[in-house]
A protein has these predicted regions:
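Phosphodiester-processing cores and adjacent nucleic acid-binding clamps
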Residues: 11, 92, 97, 102-235
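Conserved non-catalytic scaffold segment of RNase H-like nuclease domains
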Residues: 1-117, 131-153
């Protein structure tokens, strides 16, 4: 899988839920698109009947009401339909590691479905590829890439928009001569463990032109390979 070329097929998806904790909250919608050769070619969307009522606050955020999911497939049926659509492709989501994948895993566990996906998180990709943005929300990246605006907080719209974003990212990766899934890690990421360590502010003074050149290299490395909320330099 790691050797998969980036001109292959990916399943780009998004989820809506009843809350933030996958241990006690449930899926309400799964939206997805298939990206093939850098283009969105198929779409999928399903509401999910959750195991608890949707609160007014969540309805205000997502636009999904209890009436909309009343006759929707249950969690197991919806997840199985999504996995058939994904058909073993590498999954792609924004903030996948912290949110979407956790919810899918929780749903799979409750449903007795084996689910150990290979996935790409476009949040960490964007941090490495587009340093200096004021935040890395999907909408911010969409605007940075000058793509059409969309209705956020609905899985069908968010997944289609992320599919377009991912296509641009693939094109940008090709320009960096990153051509495989593994290359995303080796070519962009540096050591992610470095990013979790405590950091200190540093002032660097240079004595001459050579020092200035080396400083530029350090700054570049900090932004491209070790950017996490702030540019960092490992000791």
């Amino acid at each position: 899988v790691k050797d998969q070329p980036l001109d292959g097929e990916f399943c780009v998806f998004d989820t809506e839920t009843t809350g933030l904790d996958p241990g006690v909250e449930y899926l309400t919608e799964i939206g997805a698109v298939i990206v093939r050769n850098g283009e969105v070619v198929e779409e999928f969307d399903t509401f999910v009947k959750p195991g608890k009522p949707i609160t007014p606050k969540i309805t205000e955020l997502t636009g999904i009401t209890n009436e909309m999911v009343a006759d929707a497939p249950g969690e197991k049926e919806a997840l199985e339909a999504f996995l058939r659509f994904a058909d073993g492709r590498i999954l792609v989501a924004h903030n996948a590691h912290a949110f979407d994948i956790r919810f899918l895993k929780a749903a799979a566990k409750r449903s007795g479905i084996s689910f150990e996906p290979t996935y790409i998180d476009t949040l960490t990709m964007a941090q490495a590829m587009y340093p200096g943005l004021h935040n890395y929300k999907q909408g911010t990246i969409n605007k940075h890439l000058e793509l059409p605006s969309y209705e956020a907080h609905r899985a069908c719209e968010d997944s289609a928009a992320l599919g377009r974003i991912f296509c641009v990212m693939l094109s940008d990766l090709a320009e960096k001569e990153v051509t495989t899934v593994e290359g995303i890690n080796t070519g962009l990421g540096g050591n992610r463990e470095v990013l979790k360590k405590k950091y200190f502010h540093l002032i660097i003074l240079v004595k001459n032109q050579m020092g200035l050149k080396n400083l530029y290299k350090i700054v570049s490395e900090a932004h491209v390979n070790y950017f996490f909320k702030k540019p960092r330099v490992p000791r």
